[in-house]
């Protein structure tokens, strides 16, 4: 496990039975409350995509918008909201 993965595991909250019984919701709000960790997430995505040709980044709903736009800027490609 690398440092970023450890930091994410420590930050992401597990909320059992939300929004209904039997669902384990993973709340990433604590990640977004830590600017350096959020930046590390975007940089980690960017690093993982260095060898993949990318035409655009599509962000799906609210959380996808929050991380998709900075990633698109880092990669120098358009951002598409879905």
Give the residues covered by each predicted segment:
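PRPP-associated nucleotide enzymes
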Residues: 1-82
